[in-house]
Amino acid sequence: MSLNTKRRDFLKLAGLGGVVFASSLGPWGRALAASGQDFFFVQMSDSHWGFEGPANPEAKNTLKRAVAAVNALKHKPDFIMFTGDLIHGTPDDKLRQQRMTEFKAIVADLKVKDVRFIPGENDAGLDNGEMYKTMFGVSNYSFDHKGVHFVALDNVSDPNGFIGENQLQWLHTDLSRHDKAQPIVVFAHRPLFDLYPAWDWATNDGAKAIDILTPYENVTVFYGHIHQEHHHMTGKIAHHSAESLMWPFPLAGSQPKRSPVPWDSTHPFKGLGFTSAQTAGSGFEPSIKPIA
């Protein structure tokens, strides 16, 4: 599949005919429709709180703008998941803690009770996630919601981009308690597949996680890190990335070095948004909601 797959092309490649946008099809979808358990959640990612630079002259207002956009949704999501890079990294421990404290204060204004987090490398890569865990709790966990099993992975606390054998064993044990037909949703910061390793858009042992997930019939992965919408299939598993809340990156490999897309003063906040992921009876249908 192309490195840069947008929503319409993904639908065609996945054989979904523009009707749904997910890997989670079949019996689960019919069961959801019958039980009235349809719901949606919001994925927010890469807020980089504390960033200052020409890539976003409105950096101090962008996260607050995103919170306001989510609060303005006609219907409240069942929960919100932040998929990492909550803050912009710094080697200064006091400043990093200050940014985490400020981030928590801003997102406390979200009008949704259930707000969850996983780390990005900016949050956890400098100290193996120790400060993140103090401020936000454990970095990998699972939970169940309306018939769906959700798994939050940490593929950033190891600064070399590994999930690690202990966490992979935890993933295997966690999933083994569930039927192969139960829908599984995985959250991670980095992509689990090799999207573009030259730009660090990969997880070095992500293939092992995909191998663990492959026996399950309905698996969808939501991730961040690449600051743009992207959709990919590994076998039956669908992978969907979120836009950033601070700056967009260009398409993978479109320029020699990875650098932010320059700020466009005529279209401020272009390419910044969050994901609304809706169960539509026949699966999850993610859609990007701009904050502009």
What positions do the PLM features span?
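Short, motif-level signal for alpha-helix interfacial/capping segments enriched in acidic residues
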Residues: 25-30, 61-64, 200-216
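Short, solvent-exposed aromatic-acidic interface loops
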Residues: 288-292
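N-terminal export signals
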Residues: 1-4, 9-30
